């Protein structure tokens, strides 16, 4: 895929200055109300990844327990799925007051935002004072903290953009990669163009991470991505929406449709033509709720009761089939090695969808190790897979661990001495987080480990 429009200059606009903003220890505003998120005049003239402004921020566990890390937020120039210039925010994190090791790696971690509502964006949900109960990124801090504790720099982008475009194609990858570009140019992080970069995300974050890995060869070939961990990625959002309708997880169907209608005029027209007023109200409400509340409110919701034709028939109309084809993962092969992890008995994302994504990569000579866990389900595997993901990334940062084992079925990834050591390490990190103690390495010796 080409990105010829991405570096276009706008000579009629002056180049905006890079500027630092003061946070003044204030209660964070929602992104839609925070002027920090609004790009300055002339930002379109800058290349993707250019930092427009930055600010120091305090991060917190569930918005309440201030974390002992160094963190900034960067507003940077990026592109939409239609290659229109826009601005996005990434939150970059370092261990507090730890001397930078030689060749510190950068991890691009993607949260499972899984919502349209901006209270679920990690740039808001992870801040001290955020009122974001029910936002999934708050539950992912243990994984982020575990990476910080290793001395890694971490970039956590708002990969859905400022409009909350959940399950939109391609543009999550653009925002993630441009967030990496922004982080690598941000002097306080001590990174440079030779910095090794890893990608990691689970569920909705695994989907966004897949887009970053798929878009990187054409969009950001200069970034040295050494590996990507794709945990339980939403491989086929269209099939997911159909499968979850009327189930305990049908809130995700509502959120997905509410998001995609913003991105595709043809889909929006079909929805307006066939879904009744009550169904429209459900979609409107889903766009305002966090993931947990939407899931609880719309559990068992059956959109067949709100369509003048069956949902299956509605979703086979050409305008909608085209959308579903567009959002399906595996249509571009990543250049980096990948570790895909998925539960065999996932109650949300069908393992067959992920099998198909992996097969599409392998058919195009992609470098994939695929681990299928027979004991876990979707929610538990997020934490249970963390030691495997972290150790695999550690090896990739060191330049090892590139065997191309295509399919690795396991009874449980938790049943190994290495996994147990990993869980104990994460538990110790979380204890430090709860006590607001430093997360990073503290000794001169540990400062040089990856």
Residue map of PLM features:
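Catalytic-loop region of hydrolases
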Residues: 1-99
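Short, surface-exposed "cap/lid" segments of acyl-processing enzymes
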Residues: 80-147, 158-160
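Gly/Ser-rich "nucleophile elbow"/oxyanion-hole loop immediately N-terminal to the catalytic nucleophile
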Residues: 94-97, 102-103, 181-203, 220-224, ...
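Alpha/beta-hydrolase active-site loop
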Residues: 139-143, 149, 166-189, 211
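Glycine-rich nucleophile elbow surrounding the catalytic serine of serine-hydrolase chemistry
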Residues: 174, 201-214
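Alpha/beta-hydrolase-fold enzymes
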Residues: 211-295
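C-terminal catalytic histidine-bearing segment of alpha/beta-hydrolase fold enzymes
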Residues: 312-326, 339, 348, 355-450
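Short beta-strand/loop motif that positions the catalytic acidic residue
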Residues: 334, 339-346
């Amino acid at each position: 895929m080409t990105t010829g429009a991405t570096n276009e200059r706008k000579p009629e606009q002056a180049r905006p200055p890079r500027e630092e903003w003061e946070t003044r220890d204030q209660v964070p505003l929602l992104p839609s109300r925070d002027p920090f998120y609004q790009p300055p005049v002339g930002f379109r003239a800058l290349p993707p990844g250019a930092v427009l402004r930055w600010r120091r921020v305090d991060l917190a566990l569930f918005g309440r327990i201030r974390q002992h890390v160094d963190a900034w937020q960067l507003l940077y120039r990026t592109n939409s799925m239609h290659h229109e210039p826009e601005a996005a925010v990434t939150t970059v994190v370092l261990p507090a007051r730890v001397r930078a090791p030689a060749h510190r790696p950068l991890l691009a971690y993607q949260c499972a935002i899984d919502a349209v509502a901006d209270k679920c964006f990690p740039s808001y949900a992870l801040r001290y004072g955020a009122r974001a109960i029910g936002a999934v990124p708050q539950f992912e801090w243990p994984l982020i903290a575990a990476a910080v504790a290793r001395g890694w720099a971490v970039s956590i982008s708002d990969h859905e953009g400022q409009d909350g475009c959940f399950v939109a194609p391609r543009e999550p990858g653009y925002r993630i990669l441009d967030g990496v570009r922004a982080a690598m140019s941000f002097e306080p992080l001590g990174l440079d163009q030779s910095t090794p970069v890893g990608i990691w995300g689970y569920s909705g974050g695994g989907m966004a991470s897949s887009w970053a890995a798929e878009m990187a060869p054409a969009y950001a070939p200069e970034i040295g991505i050494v590996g990507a961990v794709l945990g339980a990625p939403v491989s086929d959002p269209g099939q997911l929406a159909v499968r979850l309708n009327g189930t305990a997880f049908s809130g995700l169907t509502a959120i997905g449709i509410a998001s995609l209608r913003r991105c595709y005029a043809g889909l929006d027209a079909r929805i307006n033509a066939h879904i009744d007023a009550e169904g429209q109200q459900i979609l409107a409400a889903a766009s305002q709720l966090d993931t947990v509340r939407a899931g609880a409110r719309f559990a068992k919701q059956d959109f067949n009761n709100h369509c003048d034709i069956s949902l299956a028939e509605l979703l086979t109309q050409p305008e909608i089939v085209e959308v579903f084809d567009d959002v399906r993962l595996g249509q571009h092969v990543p250049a980096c090695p990948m570790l895909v992890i998925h539960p065999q008995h996932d109650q949300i994302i069908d393992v067959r969808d992920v099998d198909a994504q992996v097969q599409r990569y392998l058919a195009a000579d992609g470098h994939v190790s695929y681990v299928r866990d027979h004991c876990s389900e979707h929610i538990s595997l997020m934490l249970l897979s963390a030691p495997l993901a972290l150790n695999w990334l550690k090896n990739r940062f060191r330049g090892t661990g590139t065997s191309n084992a295509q399919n690795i079925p396991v009874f449980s990834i938790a049943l190994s001495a290495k996994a147990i050591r990993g869980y104990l390490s994460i538990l110790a990190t979380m204890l430090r987080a709860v006590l607001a103690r430093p997360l990073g390495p503290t000794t001169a010796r540990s400062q040089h480990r990856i």
